[in-house]
Amino acid sequence: MRRGIHPEYRPVVYRDRAADFAFLTRSTATSEQTIEWTDGNTYPVVDVQISSASHPFWTGRQRLVDAAGRVEKFRAKYARRGPQRHR
């Protein structure tokens, strides 16, 4: 590999504030904010809006979508209004 062209790969904490959940991993992401982790070291922290701790699929709190109603609404909106002509 060529030196000096790759971003720095280092430990980073990702934090999901909505679920009060954080995890330490390695990444090239950068951040001005830092956090002291449970091991006593200070790491850059990246705030995320959603993670496995707050995503509806993983938490089991899914929101069901009325797919049948949406299909009927689509068909009503784009239904042809008259006999179809073949070209």
Swiss-Prot record:
Ribonucleoprotein listed as a keyword: yes
Pfam families per UniProt: Ribosomal_L31
InterPro entries (UniProt xref): Ribosomal_bL28/bL31-like_sf, Ribosomal_bL31, Ribosomal_bL31_B, Ribosomal_bL31_sf
GO molecular function: structural constituent of ribosome
GO cellular component, one term: ribonucleoprotein complex
Keyword annotations: Ribonucleoprotein, Ribosomal protein
Ribonucleoprotein listed as a keyword: yes
Stored SUPFAM superfamilies: L28p-like
Source species, domain of life: Bacteria
Gene Ontology biological process terms in this record: translation
NCBIfam families: L31, PRK01678.1
Entry similarity comment: Belongs to the bacterial ribosomal protein bL31 family. Type B subfamily.
Subunit structure: Part of the 50S ribosomal subunit.
Protein name: Large ribosomal subunit protein bL31B
